A protein has these predicted regions:
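Positively charged, polar, low-complexity stretches
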Residues: 1-79
Length: 79
């Protein structure tokens, strides 16, 4: 599960997503690349721990990540 406390920057957020979701080495570390990777292989469900911490660090980018996950059909739970 992604840990929002580790997402202190956009780069750190994409590192965390890559680690947790097992994204490929060519993952471009942005919202479009995340959407592309989720088309090929997506988890059924993700629990995003400490979403509030990510939101404080990332602002609207945290909501953007959540939107991409949900648009890809991932059942997202924020905690």
């Amino acid at each position: 599960m992604p840990d929002g406390a580790r997402m202190i920057s956009r780069d750190a957020a994409h590192d965390e997503l890559s680690r947790v979701l097992g994204l490929p080495a060519f993952y471009g570390r942005n919202l479009d690349a995340l959407a592309d990777c989720l088309r090929d292989a997506r988890p059924d469900a993700v629990t995003w721990r400490d979403f509030d911490a990510a939101e404080r660090s990332l602002g609207d980018h945290a909501a953007g990540i959540a939107r991409v996950l949900r648009d890809a059909g991932v059942a997202l739970t924020v905690a």
